[in-house]
């Protein structure tokens, strides 16, 4: 895949319907998306099951959230890999296969309202996550081999202006 998702310049709203919406509120404010999830984990996703090896890049600005980030190989709300920052100053590479497990974790200092330029790549069984241009985590897992991309939020809200998906070389 090679695609960029940005808020269109026109005032139409149909473009939002191309996203699978599984959050309490999905608002187009000054940013393309403002995701609000009052309790638990929520996600919006876009793409196809045929997407295999790619990198997703997005700006993520968490506000009063327990976790926020981006997801790859999304096959539903309980089947995905995600790169997320947590309220307790960590970054996690998470696998959700009907139950969540942390594949890799590290300390990562950030503040609410910071815009984090996140990317998560998958190629075969390799996963790697970057924040602000620095590789922060990597892991290997072959449980999910394809799927869409997503924006993830837990117990709070986050904002995103642009999402880009490119095929790995």
Predicted regions mapped to residue ranges:
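Extracellular glycan-recognition regions
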Residues: 1-169
């Amino acid at each position: 895949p090679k695609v960029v998702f940005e808020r269109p310049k026109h005032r139409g709203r149909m473009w939002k319907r191309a996203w699978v919406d599984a959050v309490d509120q999905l608002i187009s404010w000054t940013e393309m998306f403002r995701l609000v999830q009052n309790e638990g984990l929520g996600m919006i996703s876009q793409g196809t099951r045929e997407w295999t090896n790619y990198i997703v890049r997005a700006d993520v600005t968490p506000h009063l959230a327990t976790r926020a980030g981006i997801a790859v190989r999304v096959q539903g709300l309980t089947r995905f890999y995600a790169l997320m920052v947590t309220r307790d100053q960590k970054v996690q590479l998470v696998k959700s296969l009907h139950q969540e497990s942390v594949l890799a974790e590290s300390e990562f200092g950030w503040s609410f309202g910071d815009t984090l330029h996140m990317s998560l790549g998958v190629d075969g069984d390799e996963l790697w996550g970057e924040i602000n241009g620095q590789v922060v985590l990597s892991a290997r897992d072959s449980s999910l081999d394809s799927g869409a991309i997503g924006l993830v939020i837990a117990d709070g809200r986050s904002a995103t202006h642009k999402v880009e998906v490119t095929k790995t070389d």
